[in-house]
From Swiss-Prot:
Job of this protein: Antagonizes CBASS (cyclic oligonucleotide-based antiphage signaling system). Binds and sequesters host-produced 3',3'-cyclic GMP-AMP (cGAMP) with a dissociation constant of about 30 nM; each homohexamer binds 3 cGAMP molecules with 1 cGAMP molecule binding to 2 monomers. Sequestration of cGAMP inhibits the cGAMP-activated phospholipase activity of host CBASS effector protein CapV.
UniProt-annotated binding residues for 3',3'-cGAMP: Y8, K9, H11, K23, R79, F82
Keywords, comma-separated and alphabetical: Nucleotide-binding
Protein name listed in UniProt: Anti-CBASS protein 2
Effect of Y8A: No longer inhibits host CapV phospholipase, 5-fold decrease in cGAMP-binding
Length: 88
């Protein structure tokens, strides 16, 4: 058993392993998003066609949203495993 953290139910090695797996998956997917973002940004920078530029700009916005949602999804999954005790 791991030393307790205030506001959370007791942690176990199993719970820590699950949360580490969640965080590893988050990092891997985040790196894919970053690579796509760089690819689309470069394409936008070199684009002379306004319609294609609009599409690349939209893709950049979508990837920004995806990255934000990825962080949120990871946070909720970690909370599900660690089960915080809300006392307010």
């Amino acid at each position: 058993m791991i030393e307790d953290i205030k506001g959370y139910k007791p942690h176990t090695e199993e719970k820590i392993g699950k949360v580490n797996a969640i965080k590893d998956a988050e990092v891997r997917l985040g790196l894919i998003f970053d690579a796509l973002y760089d690819e689309f940004w470069e394409a936008l920078d070199n684009c002379e066609d306004c319609e294609f530029a609009k599409n690349y700009a939209e893709s950049l916005d979508q990837l920004t949203i995806a990255k934000t949602k990825l962080k949120e999804a990871s946070m909720w999954a970690c909370r599900a495993v660690f089960q915080p005790e809300e006392k307010y």
